[in-house]
Structures are given as structure tokens and as C-alpha cells.
Amino acid sequence: MKERRFRLVTSNLIICAVLGLVLASALFALTPETPAAVEANNAVYEGNPESGRVALMFNVYEGTEYVEEIARLISERGWNTTFFVGGKWAEKNGDTVVRLAAEGFELGNHGYLHRDHAKLDAAGNREEIVITEKLLRAILSDLSDEQADAAVPPLFAPPSGSLGNTMFEVCEELGYTAIMWTRDTIDWRDHDAALIAERALKGIKAGDLILLHPTEKTVEALPSILDGIAAAGLTADTVTATLSATANEP
């Protein structure tokens, strides 16, 4: 009897172990790639610490009514910024895209449909990036090639910060740099202007890439953020300038 009970317990333990392995394998298969799982994480998380600059990066798929107010507040300081625009948004807001470029703002690539790039194959990654670039350049067709190159640099901000090996391979193929962030204000979720400003400014330093979105509370927080940047002896500029500039450059 004892031997039979022992065999039964042993069999049950083996079955549980096998089921556990199957479940773990299934969960692993369903889990998207994260930075830790990416073999070669070539994303940029911060700019040049000697630049004297920080970059305010606005990811834009909605909030059109706040975009131009954000641009105005930054322009009033004589500063600059980068708007990472979604292709679908740009398609519906071509006039705003033209005005931003005309005012000297940088327009990065945020994909066309805000898809999870860790789950896309090479064709899907390529399509999202290329369609958005072609769309932006078509909207800005009145610009010279040199002006368009400056306005639409090969910078890609993956939606939701979702990274994958295939995405990096496609970025390299297309000549794009994947841009992440040093600090995330989480303004899309937390509608609290004081909290947004605190997250943007706490421990701020040259080279920081600060992620924001066009929301009502972000606009409310922006004057405090800009004041805090100035108080730290820094200026706000585009991602390109923050990555490459040195303190003695204009």
C-alpha cells in the first residue's frame, strides 16, 4: 500500500512539474521582448552630458489641441524641441506638421499606427517606419531636401518603448537611431501638473531626454518645467542637438 501511495505521489509530482514547464513555456512565448531580452540594445537613453542641453520629447498620436500651445511656450524661450509624430496623426494634421517644421521644430518618427514593435516581423517594422517617413516628407514637400532632412531626421521612438531584436535590425537597415528616454513623466496617465513637473525636473542634468505627451496637464506643467530647466543652467533643445552638441556650441 505504501509503495503504491509513493508511486502515486511521485507520478503526481512529475505531472505537476511537466505542466509547470508547459505553462512557463507558453507564458514565455506570449511575453514580448524587453530590453533585457534584446541581444543588442542599441537604443539611446540619454544625450551628451557636456551639451548643456536637455531634450523635451513629445510623442504625438493625439492631443492636437495642445501641440501648438506647447510649441508656442517653448518658442517664447528661444528654445527648441522634438515632436515624435505618429503617421496616422500626421496624416490628419498636415497643417500642424507644416507649421511645426516652418518654426524649426524637429519631427521624429513614432510609427504609423502605434503598434508593438517587439511583436512585429521585419516587414511590419519596416512598413511602420517607412510609411511615416514618406508621409512626413510628402506633407513637407515644399521644403528643400536639405530642409526636409533637418526637419525629419532618422530618429525613431518606439511606441510604448517596446524594443525587439528585429526592430533594431530594421532601424540599422534604414539608418535610424532608436530613441528611448532618461526620464518618463507618465503624463499620459497621471493628470497632475505638479507631479509631471516634478518627474521632469528632479535630478535633471545635461543630456537628459524627457518624455512627454500633449495633454492639458502637460501644458499646465510646461512653464514650471521650462523655469526649472533654466534654473539648472540648462536649455531645452532637439534630440539631435542634445545628442551631439557640446556646451560651447550655439
Task: For each feature predicted by the language model, list its residue ranges.
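Binuclear metal-dependent phosphoesterase catalytic core
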Residues: T218-A247
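N-terminal Lys/Arg-rich, disordered targeting/topogenic segments
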Residues: M1-T10
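Structural recognition of the beta-strand scaffold that forms the well-ordered cores
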Residues: A55-M57, T81-V85, E106-N109, P154-P158, ...
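Active-site beta->alpha N-cap acidic-glycine motif
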Residues: E33-L120, G124, E128-S144, A148-P153, ...
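Non-membrane alpha-helical structural segments and their capping/turn regions in soluble enzymes
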Residues: A122-V130, A194, L201, V219
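Basic- and aromatic-lined ligand-binding clefts that recognize polyanionic substrates
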Residues: I139-C171, K217
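His/Asp/Glu-enriched short active-site or ligand-binding loop at hydrolase and phosphoryl-transfer sites
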Residues: S162-L163, M167-G203, L234-A245
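Hydrophobic membrane-insertion alpha-helices, especially the h-region
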Residues: S11-F28
